[in-house]
Amino acid sequence: MISESQGGLMSAFTTPPKFSGFIRRLVEEGYVNAQNMQQALEKAKKFKQDIVPYLIDNFSISPLTIAEIISLEFGEPLLDLGVFDPALFLKDKIDEKLIQKYRIMPLVHRGHVLYVATSNPTNIEAMDAIRFNSKLKVEPIIVEHDKLERLLSEHFVEETHFNFDTEELDLDVEVDPHTTDDDDEDDKLKDEAPIVKYINKLLIDAIRMSASDLHFEPYEKSYRVRYRVDGVLRLIATPPLQLATRLASRLKVMSQMDISEKRVPQDGRIKLKMSKSKTIDFRVNSLPTLFGEKIVLRILDPASAMLGIDALGYEPEQKALFMEALNKPQGMLLITGPTGSGKTVSLYTGLNILNTEHANISTAEDPVEINLEGVNQVNVNPKVGLTFAAALRSFLRQDPDIIMVGEIRDLETAEIAIKAAQTGHLVMSTLHTNNAAETLTRLRNMGVASFNIATSVNLVIAQRLARRLCSQCKRPIQVPERSLLEMGFTPEDLAQPEFQIFEPVGCHDCREGYKGRVGIYEVMKITPEISKIIMEDGNALEIAATAETLGFNNLRRSGLKKVMQGVTSLQEINRVTSE
């Protein structure tokens, strides 16, 4: 029998938490469940972080979604920062330290009222601090968090990493950028605060620009730094050539490489703490080139693996096929595409969906890119005999439910993976092929028996990443009907009343007309018809033709659908898919 006091105690633990304001709306509309929201509020408070960026960083909620919900809750319009002249921002009305601490921007001063842009008008501490500092009444104006952050990064210099100039360095020192002598550079770096600041600035700038890679490149008479943003390399900086060795050495120290070894490539890793609750990893590789060491960093943001399937760009029917394959107790799910096409994010998204307390998940990766809590991840190391095949054999003795292999590269790995898929395990992996049909014939060319391919593979996904048109500046264009038909549009497409194509323009928000990327997918289920072709040793063309008759869109068709939806441009689809 439970006493009254015990009952009260139990109800205290079982009563769902009560939320208010935009937090309540986010929970009610299903963006975050009540338990996760309560934990988010507690962690944000513990880390002294605003709840809005915390939710954006740790859940699949876009800045626009949160801004719209806050706008709805307050009954105030959502402001587009692009309508303001940046030269007129009232940066002198508030102490710069407060602007950086609370991430706000003073916009308009009228009488005794100061209007400030903020992504969270419920931050009472921030409003009070600004009111006290400015001696004015403060009225919040709701804006999107990412746009506000971009604006702040452009207009303010953060003390920790943005007040560096190459003029601070002693460039008169005789430094041979092509030297290979073993210097005591580790000791020198301790005193090179400007170099440290410069590297930190470049790393953080890359994250804020949503870059995927950073390239530090020495040449005979110049040095350059480039970022890959939305799949395209952009020139960012041209530091003096005299800094080449010092920049490379600093990056190698940060990634725990041997700075005295300049003759062979090296791999390393950097962890950059952005806040108390967010850390970004960089995978680093050095390459000895003719004029010094080229360093390339790949940004590994854990948040990219937590986006959720809806953020990847699947069409509804493609998403349904993906989820169906994930929910099967056994079989193989293969993802294919070139390097940089988003295969890893797709795999991790699937693993996150499957990652429950009831599943034993093991992965073999080269290397592990993002740490997933609750998943047993293994870095393959062929030098010591830990190959993909060796890891797979070990997994089968570990009572697995789900196995992920980073890439199927050889017959041994393929055969073990297929054996696992046929004996009660769900296996996920990738290959480098051009489309879904070629993936099946590639396995056969490796030496896998056609019967085993037909009976073990459940689904093949081919994918590309296309740049997403900026919603602020894209504009409609007229293209001759004949040209559209030649590009792959159908007469039925052109007959739709809402048919419209857009092109990039470029604005303050995006600069080049594109902002972000979207996935283009070919999702092919292995049906009885396709299985029959595989077992009869049919070629990729036959498989692709049958898939088309069954209603599976190829990459080109999926891309054209994104064009008709106004998500991307014809130029982008022509770039990432074939006719």
Curated annotation (Swiss-Prot):
The keyword Nuclease does not apply. This is Type IV pilus assembly ATPase PilB. Both PilB and TfpB are essential for optimal T4P production, with each motor playing a distinct role in T4P extension. Overexpression of pilB does not restore the transformation defect of a tfpB mutant. It comes from Acinetobacter baylyi (strain ATCC 33305 / BD413 / ADP1). Inhibited by the inhibitory protein CpiA. The keyword Transcription does not apply. ATP binds at G340, S341, G342, K343, T344, V345. InterPro entries: ATPase_typ4_pilus-assembl_PilB, P-loop_NTPase, T2SS/T4SS_dom, T2SS_E_N_sf, T2SS_GspE_N. Its main location: cytoplasm.
